[in-house]
């Protein structure tokens, strides 16, 4: 089976023990049998679509992709998280409902819910938004919290989570 993955998913493919694969931002450009890509992406070939926004999603994605090879057990997957303290900490959802935020974008919504912040449309203290929306936000009294989007962060999902969560942890 010829596997094609995107650069953002390559680390999960490696961790899962798959060695024979092709990396292309546009998997349909390759003559592949199967693609591993982010959930918001679409391809014509058979695929697994994974989410990598939160530690929980990353864990489940590693578990799913590893089924294509020799399935990793929970302890083997957790071992990859030990070098990343925020990834390890947020493998379980938290309750930080005292932090009230308005959030823009689905990928940030996943993160905010995982961290246990309360999502509000009114009476919020912070507006959390992806960097590509900076010029589209209205003036507000709330504190703006800019989070790097996919184009502005590491391809490694652990490093990406650490960076984003470290910004948001300052709100607690």
Where are these regions (language model features)?
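Binding-cleft/active-site segments that stabilize strongly anionic ligands or cofactors
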Residues: 7-55, 85-172
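Extreme N-terminal starter segment of soluble prokaryotic enzymes
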Residues: 1-3
């Amino acid at each position: 089976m010829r596997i094609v993955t995107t650069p953002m998913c390559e680390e999960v493919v490696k961790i899962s023990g798959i060695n024979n694969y092709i990396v292309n931002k546009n998997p349909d450009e390759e003559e592949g049998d199967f693609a591993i890509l982010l959930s918001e992406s679409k391809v014509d070939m058979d695929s697994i679509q994974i989410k990598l926004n939160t530690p929980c999603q990353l864990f489940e994605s590693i578990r799913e992709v590893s089924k294509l090879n020799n399935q990793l057990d929970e302890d083997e997957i957790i071992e990859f998280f030990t070098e990343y303290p925020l990834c390890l900490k947020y493998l379980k959802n938290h309750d930080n409902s005292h932090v009230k935020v308005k959030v823009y974008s689905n990928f940030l919504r996943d993160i905010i819910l995982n961290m246990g912040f309360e999502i509000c449309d009114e009476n919020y203290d912070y507006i959390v938004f992806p960097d590509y929306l900076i010029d589209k936000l209205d003036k507000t009294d709330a504190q703006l919290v800019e989070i790097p989007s996919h184009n502005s962060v590491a391809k490694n999902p652990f490093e990406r989570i650490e960076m984003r969560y470290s910004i948001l942890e300052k709100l607690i």
